[in-house]
Amino acid sequence: MKILVINCGSSSLKYQLIDMQGEKVLCKGLCERIGMESSMITHEANGNKATTPAIFPTHTEAFAEVVKKMTTGDGKVIDDVSEINAIGHRVVHGGEKFQASCLITPEVIETLRELSPLAPLHNPAGILGIEAAKKVFGDIPNVAVFDTAFHSTMPPKAFMYAIPYEYYEKYGVRRYGFHGTSHKYVSYRAAEYLEEPIDRLKLITCHLGNGSSIAAVDQGKVVDTSMGMTPLAGRMMGTRCGDIDPSVVNYLKYTLNITGHQLDEILNKKSGLLGVSGVSSDKRDVEAAAAAGNPRAQLASDMLNYQIKKTIGSYIAAMGGVDAIVFTGGIGEHDADSRAKICHHMDWLGIRVDTDKNANAHKQNKDVVEITAWGAKVRTLVIETNEELMIARDTKEVLGNEGLL
């Protein structure tokens, strides 16, 4: 069976067509600048990759161009869209309504609209993608896979905020967590690599990139995660502040005489590595500046590594131990120096990485590389995440549960 995986932004459409027999990517691509001038599509298939100009007034036209690329020319991988068995959509926020992936119905779409205030930048774009896909692909089943779903196993003591309880009851104010699809994929891949059932493992998964989150996964269930009601919470990120004293918000608002929207822009887009270093939101640029003697860049790097280390320690305490630490995401997979600094002085917890294995992990050309030092009790893994494949797997599972296979 073939599943089309979709990740829609307000002006973009990312896609992969996966043949589930062998879990092979047949093609992938990106439609950019939807609704703007100079729209374009990049399509990769059969060893060819090409970017061509296009006209995308809406996501519907973008999907139509994706179909054209998949069925004609050098990028052809199918004869007709009828060969596609289902479409899996990444949806950022499922709130408490959706604790697992589900078949998309008109009722589901309406509920997603109701949840849009929880993710105003992401859920409306996801709905646009779903509705456009239904127009272009007709009766092909559509499945929603939620970033928040894997974290829905958190107990109330982990997800509740210590504010009046009625705000949770009336407005859904609580910790939800994000990057769930990535955390789920690397958790199961770690269990597979370790040759242990996931329900016997205590894992800490670190998805580190421009956006970063950490999850404590005990026996296959998330018991805590670093992001909160929104992806702004948790560890500092490329441009996001992460956890700060809530009183700072009001203090800055009145001191700077700015609106809530302006403050939101500062905390989401001008903070984190960029705000502290004054150099860049990209960890590589920050590290280069630090190496050149920039003290603020060094501070930003030290802060991030320290915060991640502190979170790992707290999650070990929460779970009463840990079997493996997993690094994934752009920083987690490629930044050996950060991995080394995060794990430094954690020998007393049984965590120690091999210097050579860590430094050469990127050269192994494997989706899982173990960097555990000899004698360390806790295994340390670098795992290449694959959110698209996880979405495809969830989509296939939903079809099976609905009797549509």
List the model feature ranges, each with a label.
Residues E265, G272-V276, K283-A318:
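Adenine-nucleotide phosphate-binding core of ATP-dependent small-molecule kinases
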Residues M70-H122, V143, A149-A158:
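Short beta-strand-loop/turn "lid" adjacent to the catalytic site in phosphate-handling enzymes
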Residues F150-Y254:
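Glycine-rich phosphate-binding loop of actin/hexokinase-like ATP-binding domains
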Residues M1-L4:
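Extreme N-terminal starter segment of soluble prokaryotic enzymes
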Residues Q298, D302-A318, G332-L405:
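Internal helix-turn-beta structural module
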Residues S12-F56, G228:
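Short glycine-rich, Thr/Ser-proximal phosphate-binding strand/loop in the N-terminal lobe
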Residues D218, D224-L256, E265, G329-H362, ...:
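Catalytic phosphate/nucleotide-handling subdomain of diverse soluble enzymes
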Residues K69-I84, A190-P197, I312-D323:
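Phosphate/pyrophosphate-binding loops at sites that engage ATP/ADP/AMP, CoA/4′-phosphopantetheine
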